[in-house]
């Protein structure tokens, strides 16, 4: 067994870490609380632009096809920063959710999830 992270996994993690250091500061989170708006739409849109939302979907389905290790590294960095947006829910549940739908509905849902107009929450 090989327990060493690949260069690609580490690069993905560092990209997320760098983004969060700039965009998910304690001040920005506190501002959301103060405004009673913990969900930051601009930050969500930026996460979509980075390909984070649905990143574990296959490339055929519009994702990056990242594996569970890279996904976990990404979510771990988001936890460190206190990111309030539902990225973990969106990414961990999307494949299982999409598997229960027929192809025609699945395609329409993928488009909505990838562009951020629909959210998965628990």
Regions of interest found by a model, annotated:
Residues 1, 21, 35:
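Catalytic cores of phosphodiester-bond-cleaving enzymes
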Residues 1-8:
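Intrinsic disorder at enzyme termini
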Residues 9, 20, 74:
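Residue-level signal for inorganic ion chemistry
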Residues 24-122:
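Glycine-rich flavin
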């Amino acid at each position: 067994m090989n327990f060493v992270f690949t260069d690609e996994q580490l690069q993905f993690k560092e990209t997320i870490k760098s983004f969060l250091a700039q965009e998910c500061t304690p001040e920005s989170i506190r501002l959301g609380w103060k405004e009673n708006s913990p969900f930051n739409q601009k930050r969500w849109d930026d996460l979509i632009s980075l390909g984070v939302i649905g990143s574990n979907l296959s490339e055929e389905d519009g994702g990056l096809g990242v594996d569970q290790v890279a996904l976990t590294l990404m979510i771990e960095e988001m936890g460190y920063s206190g990111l309030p947006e539902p990225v973990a829910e969106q990414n961990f549940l999307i494949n299982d959710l999409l598997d229960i739908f027929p192809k025609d509905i699945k395609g329409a849902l993928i488009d909505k999830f990838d562009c951020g107009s629909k959210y998965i929450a628990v």
